[in-house]
UniProtKB/Swiss-Prot annotation:
Its EC number is 7.1.1.-. PANTHER family: NAD(P)H-QUINONE OXIDOREDUCTASE SUBUNIT M, CHLOROPLASTIC. One of its GO terms (cellular component) is plasma membrane-derived thylakoid membrane. NDH-1 shuttles electrons from an unknown electron donor, via FMN and iron-sulfur (Fe-S) centers, to quinones in the respiratory and/or the photosynthetic chain. The immediate electron acceptor for the enzyme in this species is believed to be plastoquinone. Couples the redox reaction to proton translocation, and thus conserves the redox energy in a proton gradient. Cyanobacterial NDH-1 also plays a role in inorganic carbon-concentration. It is a peripheral membrane protein. It is found in: Cellular thylakoid membrane. It catalyses: a plastoquinone + NADH + (n+1) H(+)(in) = a plastoquinol + NAD(+) + n H(+)(out); a plastoquinone + NADPH + (n+1) H(+)(in) = a plastoquinol + NADP(+) + n H(+)(out). Belongs to the complex I NdhM subunit family. It comes from Crocosphaera subtropica (strain ATCC 51142 / BH68) (Cyanothece sp. (strain ATCC 51142)). This is NAD(P)H-quinone oxidoreductase subunit M. NDH-1 can be composed of about 15 different subunits; different subcomplexes with different compositions have been identified which probably have different functions. One of its GO terms (molecular function) is quinone binding.
Length: 119
């Protein structure tokens, strides 16, 4: 079994993809963002996640390739995705097969509540 980190929206594997299969690797990480398509993504938001991933991997260079270290990166990326959602850079995909609002209920403004809950 290869080293991996799986969160709700981020999956990281110490593996490469060959013929649509994951093949264990000691020098390659594969990132799967939002595998259940819970969010609507544009290319800019995805690139932000990829850049953050690269930054976190670079910061961890020289450390052991372990489940623990990958989970730290995965957890940091999960929080990053939450920030993208809270900042309105991504949104829930209401046509997704998964509608559990795992990062909080969607914010819907109405004339009665507009601006009432700003912190």
């Amino acid at each position: 079994m290869f080293v991996k980190s799986t969160t709700r929206h981020i999956r990281i594997y110490a593996a490469e993809v060959h013929n649509s299969e994951l093949v264990e690797s000691d020098n390659m990480l594969t990132l799967d963002v939002d595998p259940d398509n819970e969010f609507n993504w544009d290319e800019d938001a995805l690139q932000k996640v990829y850049r953050k991933f690269d930054e976190l991997v670079e910061a961890a260079s020289g450390e052991e390739l372990s489940d623990y270290n990958l989970r730290r990166i995965g957890s940091d990326l999960e929080h990053f995705v939450r920030n993208l959602l809270q900042n309105g850079e991504i949104s829930y995909n209401l046509k997704s097969r998964v509608l559990n609002y795992s990062m909080g209920l969607p914010k819907v403004e109405s004339p009665e509540t507009e601006g009432a809950y700003n912190l």
